[in-house]
Amino acid sequence: MSLVTLQDIFQLGYPEYACTHPLPAHVRKAARAIMHGRTAVLGGHVHACPDGHISRIWYNACRHRSCPQCAFLQVERWLATQRARLLACAHSQVILTLPHDLHPLWREPVPRMTALVFQTVRDTLTTLLAEPTYLGAPPGIIAALHTWGQTLGLHPPLHGLVTGGGWTADGQWKAVRHGLLVPGRVAMALFRGTGLAALRTAWPRDALQLPEDLRPQAFLTRLHRLGHPQQTRWHVHRQERSPHGTGVATSLARSMRGGPLKNPRLVAWDGETVTFRYMENPTQAAEASGRQQQRTLPIGDFLQRVLQHVPPPGTQVVRSWGLSHARHADALPVCRTQLDQPPVVLPVRLDWQTVCAQRGDAHPAQCPLCGQLLVCTMVLPRGGVSPPASSPERAA
């Protein structure tokens, strides 16, 4: 288990980085959250055994979606709700990735490009699956976008969880008749055409802002080149169908919150450089085992890579369509009945103590000696002094 944490690196490396790099307000807010989450700065509570056996201090979470140690509760709550709603049918994961030539557009207002990508993927999947040749009915789709690759560079794939069937116009559940829900070459061609059409429509309407170093004529030339499949590929990766959607839903949940790098992937840092693990080819799970690599970056480059993935306020990175959308709430119970499933029973809102217990840890709110629940004896105000971060030598 790694001893170094992202919080350690930020506490010791971010203040100097912030002095020399102008950062947007939402990025500075994220950095402060990563540094202060579950420390005395945010206040906390003292809990003690009624019989005086032990007492514990629990500091408050920052609840920022880019913080890897404070986002787990929101992830587990979302995942519990989705598990309760999943249909008892096969599911497929589809990963759609824009060409690298479009990456500069992400440097401008991120919400605009995010909306355009979701629109493109929605139109691609719903149009394709509406064809009787492939399904002929709207399925349930949950899509999640994250903007990073394994080495923390800009790589914005959109992951979609698609049900292996859909809801027909005459009110019947229709299952996929063959193994491939989305045919690869057809999906790539439609993805390319839909994406280029969306870009050409958005730019004249000022719904898309070009970078300063990309002239309009150069942008149009780039779009023309992106329309040739021999020159540029619009990747559509289809993973093997799963008999249920729990595994893919869990993967989507992990990418929703917590930022691009979780603490277990950190290897070491010495105050000047950070070393972390990455998977060479994560989309090929069977081949990826044993292909774990390590990369070392200067602290400035590392912080820049992490912070570039902080989404601006209001950016929605998870969306639902078809049977998974709220507008089809009336159809979902009928589908469950036809699939011999009971009605949806939403879970009780999870608290962090329950989540810790579900992970197999000792229940944090129970006294390890007598088993009684700990009671709150003191509230610690915000603004306390956080303990110093681990030194680089100790963290390594």
Residue positions per predicted region:
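Beta->alpha loop/short-helix hinge microenvironment recognizer with preference
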Residues: 1-396
